[in-house]
Curated annotation (Swiss-Prot):
Residues reported in the UniProt entry to bind L-glutamate: S148, A169, S170, T171, Y219, D301, K394
Membrane topology: Multi-pass membrane protein
Positions on the Extracellular side per record topology: 24-579, 638-648, 713-742, 801-813
InterPro entries hit by this protein: ANF_lig-bd_rcpt (IPR001828), GPCR_3 (IPR000337), GPCR_3_9-Cys_dom (IPR011500), GPCR_3_9-Cys_sf (IPR038550), GPCR_3__mGluR6 (IPR000112), GPCR_3_C (IPR017978), GPCR_3_CS (IPR017979), GPCR_3_mtglu_rcpt (IPR000162)
Disulfide bridge map: C51-C93, C238-C530, C361-C377, C417-C424, C512-C531, C516-C534, C537-C549, C552-C565
Function of the protein: G-protein coupled receptor for glutamate. Ligand binding causes a conformation change that triggers signaling via guanine nucleotide-binding proteins (G proteins) and modulates the activity of down-stream effectors, such as adenylate cyclase. Signaling inhibits adenylate cyclase activity. Signaling stimulates TRPM1 channel activity and Ca(2+) uptake. Required for normal vision.
Quaternary assembly: Homodimer. Interacts with GPR179. Interacts with photoreceptor synaptic protein LRIT1 (via its N-terminal extracellular domain).
Gene3D superfamilies xrefs: 3.40.50.2300, GPCR, family 3, nine cysteines domain
Ranges for region Disordered: 850-871
Protein's recorded name: Metabotropic glutamate receptor 6
Length: 871
């Protein structure tokens, strides 16, 4: 409380020195209650000058709107009957410090009322007495200002004197702080709503990476701050750069701004909270940098649907989306303003200057000399006929601000002066705090038919129209602003109406990273949530969502674009497969040959050749060869439990039986001749019965092992998805097979291969047997060839383990190897004998037998020969 008198005395002294009462320009209207008005009639002046060029729309249109509204209020018998509203309208020159000086005139009467009342102390600069000595009006409320920085400066003074203030254009969120600006209200929504609308627009366009551009000051900085805060809370939008345009930009400043924006070229969307001059100079710098069409502007209400910021810069503005508080053109004001002339509008002291500017003429010549460069005004010119005219966008809000004060005064008058016409003592003077209470309580339909009301912070509800500047027939200069949507707590944006450079119907991107393709996940860049790298879901992984890749289940493989999983195809070797053709052909031919030979031997069972071959072991060997050929059919058949059991049992049985018989034969021959070198006593176990016992004894080990395996692990078919899980998922197959691994399969053959190797060793040892003993050498050749076949089999079988055709190659290799080994035994041991039996029966005589017998006698005692003869 102690600081207020000091401040008041300081203000009184400043007023006496400032010359405010000394002819400073203002519009005055007499009335019982005076309203103040602050309008940017002139632009900010250059260095050393307070004011610059006249602002026809933002300045004169808005000022005339207040005069129009006052005329309407004063002419309304139902509103404030008996009370006439006066006015004191001042020019802020678009500068906050100058506006503060002007606004001090609103509190002049209050200061002098609290001071010593010595009006003689008021002097103009140089000691000249004031032109008017009438006491200043007592202002009850103020309409204005326009710029947020000006409103903030003025509000700090008006609140000290409890003078309510209603702005028609100030939207800075800072002004919503009722603890600091408790006497401030506005009929336009704050930028926090506007910022929310702009965030919604950015999200609707699919942008996630934008830059912000703000004019230094409360409006620009607060607007951007609100946008950044809301976008952070909403998520999904990142700020590439936040650039501030200095209040007094240096030469080249705007080129520097453009260069900075191009440091993040993917952030094409530019959120701009800037005054008209800055908007224009940014567009000019864009043109000079040859970047027309690169930036995608989203402008605040300071841009709105105005022509002045983009005049002659339409190419750079094409596609710009702008926001404007929802408004309507007031027809009554158009009729009022278009009938204004120099004769009927003398109350507006700036109207003559407007007339010259609007019609490009001069009312008087400088220095009394005629000026040939500019025509002279006739005074008969008409607005809208001899000059272009379009109602300025804030006219509606100026009118609504005046009516809000009028309605509040009316309600206050009804409460304090019931039944009284004109002002009563309770309203002389008018208490500002009481008036503020009634202002915050007003609710009426404004000049455009929309509700006018205030919340507890003095803010109006957020309602915006959304525009886009579009070219017409490919020409930007003949284009215009097209309404594309609305915002009232939620966005309604008509995407079909939007038009863009390049492809008119495709929204240009403003993203840090391009969208990932199908089957790719986003790998976020640390610290920049809107930037990412695209990582392919390779191998057997598929895209779960935009951030995650997961492996497909074991029985599935990814789709070609890796966006999902699909069943892995199941394959097996079928009867019709080309891979089965050769094995089946060999097996059929082998079985036919084996059957023919066995039948031939059985038919000629007692002939010398058959007897000399060892009939018992020959039949065992032929049976083993038959089983080897037969296994091919089991390997091609569709796997099931029975087939799998038969495979286990017969896969090694045929080879074991064959090689057991050959081993027994080879061992017998070797032992006979080795024994013959040392003694005439025959070796043991060389009789046919002994040979059969040895053969079946060796074979029984294989049978017992397989039976034990069947009991321990019952056979069944499985689909093996790992066997054909190739690097390329497109080549992956599930293999329907018996539950036998490659090693298990080789294990089935392992014992028979051991017998084969042992037999080969004996065949090598018996290679010195006399040539007349014809069984040893064919057996030797058979075993050598068989070893070569199986040596070739192993690398082929295991070398194709990762092949996409593994199931076919391995099965074919195995069956062909078995058939070839059986064919070698059949061809070398029995085909020659069968040939002799069938085609040269004259050789199948005792002589042949004698030859064999003679050979045997060389290595065996006479009694063994007799035994052979007994056979």
């Amino acid at each position: 409380m102690g600081r207020l008198p000091v401040l008041l005395l300081w203000l009184a002294w400043w007023l006496s020195q400032a010359g405010i009462a000394c002819g400073a320009g203002s519009v005055r209207l007499a009335g019982g209650l005076t309203l103040g008005g602050l309008f940017p009639v002139h632009a900010r002046g250059a260095a050393g000058r307070a004011c610059g060029a006249l602002k026809k729309e933002q300045g004169v249109h808005r000022l005339e709107a207040m005069l129009y509204a006052l005329d309407r209020v004063n002419a309304d018998p139902e509103l404030l009957p008996g009370v006439r509203l006066g006015a004191r309208l001042l020019d802020t020159c678009s500068r906050d410090t100058y506006a503060l000086e002007q606004a001090l005139s609103f509190v002049q009467a209050l200061i002098r009322g609290r001071g010593d009342g010595d009006e003689a102390s008021v002097r103009c600069p140089g000691g000249v007495p004031p032109l008017r000595s009438a006491p200043p009006e007592r202002v009850v409320a103020v309409v204005g200002a326009s710029a947020s920085s000006v409103s903030i400066m003025v509000a700090n003074v008006l609140r000290l004197f409890a003078i309510p203030q209603i702005s028609y254009a100030s939207t800075a969120p800072e002004l919503s702080d009722s603890t600091r600006y408790d006497f401030f209200s506005r009929v336009v929504p704050p930028d926090s709503y506007q910022a929310q609308a702009m965030v919604d627009i950015v999200r609707a366009l699919g942008w996630n990476y934008v830059s912000t551009l703000a004019s230094e000051g409360n409006y620009g900085e607060s607007g951007v701050e609100a946008f950044v805060q809301i976008s952070r809370e909403a998520g999904g939008v990142c700020i590439a750069q936040s650039i501030k345009i200095p209040r007094e930009p240096k030469p080249g400043e705007f080129h520097k701004v453009i260069r900075r924006l191009m440091e993040t070229p993917n952030a094409r969307g530019i959120i701009i909270f800037a005054n008209e001059d800055d908007i224009r100079r940014v567009l000019e710098a864009t043109r000079q940098a040859n970047l027309t069409g690169h930036f995608l502007w989203v402008g605040s209400d300071s841009w709105g649907s105005k022509i002045s910021p983009i005049l002659n810069l339409e190419e750079e503005a094409v596609g710009a989306i702008t926001i404007l508080p929802k408004r309507a053109s007031i027809d009554g004001f158009d009729q009022y303003f278009m009938t204004r002339s120099l004769e009927n509008n003398r109350r507006n002291i700036w109207f003559a200057e407007f007339w010259e500017e609007n019609f490009n003429c001069k009312l008087t010549s400088s220095g009394g000399q005629s000026d040939d460069s500019t025509r002279k005004c006739t005074g008969e010119e008409r607005i809208g006929q001899d000059s272009a005219y379009e109602q300025e966008g804030k006219v509606q809000f100026v009118i609504d601000a005046v009516y809000a004060i009028a309605h509040a005064l009316h309600s206050m008058h009804q409460a304090l002066c019931p039944g009284h016409t004109g002002l009563c003592p309770a309203m002389e003077p008018t208490d500002g705090r009481t008036l503020l209470h009634y202002i915050r309580a007003v609710r009426f339909n404004g000049s455009a038919g929309t509700p006018v009301m205030f919340n507890e912070n003095g803010d109006a509800p957020g309602r915006y129209d959304i525009f886009q500047y579009q070219a017409t027939n490919g020409s930007a200069s003949s284009g215009g602003y097209q309404a594309v949507g609305q915002w009232a707590e939620a966005l309604r944006l008509d995407m079909e109406v939007l038009r863009w450079s390049g492809d008119p119907h495709e929204v240009p991107p403003s993203q840090c990273s391009l969208p990932c393709g199908p089957g790719e996940r986003k790998k976020m860049v640390k610290g920049v949530p809107c930037c990412w790298h695209c990582e392919a879901c390779d191998g057997y992984r598929f895209q779960v969502d935009e951030f995650t890749c997961e492996a497909c289940p074991g029985d599935m493989r990814p789709t070609p674009n890796h966006t999902g999983c699909r069943p892995t195809p199941v394959v097996r070797l079928t009867w019709s497969s080309p891979w089965a053709a050769l094995p089946l052909l060999l097996a059929v031919l082998g079985i036919m040959a084996t059957t023919t030979i066995m039948a031939t031997f059985m038919r000629h069972n007692d002939t010398p050749i058959v007897r000399a071959s060892g009939r018992e072991l020959s039949y065992v060997l032929l049976t083993g060869i038959f089983l080897i050929y037969a296994i091919t059919f089991l390997m091609v058949a569709e796997p099931c439990a029975a087939i799998c059991a038969a495979r286990r049992l017969l896969l090694g049985l045929g080879t074991t039986l064959s090689y057991s018989a050959l081993l027994t034969k080879t061992n017998r021959i070797y032992r006979i001749f080795e024994q013959g070198k040392r003694s005439v006593t025959p070796p043991p176990f060389i009789s046919p019965t002994s040979q059969l016992v040895i053969t079946f004894g060796l074979t029984s080990l294989q049978v017992v092992g397989v039976i034990a395996w069947l009991g321990a692990q019952p056979p069944h078919s499985v689909i093996d998805y790992e066997e054909q899980r190739t690097v390329d998922p497109e080549q992956a197959r599930g293999v329907l097979k018996c539950d036998m691994s490659d090693l298990s399969l080789i294990g089935c053959l392992g014992y028979s291969l051991l017998l084969m190797v042992t037999c080969t060793v004996y065949a090598i040892k018996a290679r010195g047997v006399p040539e007349t003993f014809n069984e040893a050498k064919p057996i030797g050749f058979t075993m050598y060839t068989t070893c070569i076949i199986w040596l070739a089999f192993v690398p082929i079988f295991f070398g194709t383990a990762q092949s996409a055709e593994k199931i076919y190659i391995q099965t074919t290799t195995l069956t062909v190897s078995l058939s070839l080994s059986a064919s070698v035994s059949l061809g070398m041991l029995y085909v020659p004998k069968t040939y002799v039996i069938l085609f040269h029966p004259e050789q199948n005589v005792q002589k042949r037998k004698r030859s064999l017998k003679k050979t045997s006698t060389m290595a065996a005692p006479p009694q063994n020969e007799n035994a052979e003869d007994a056979k």
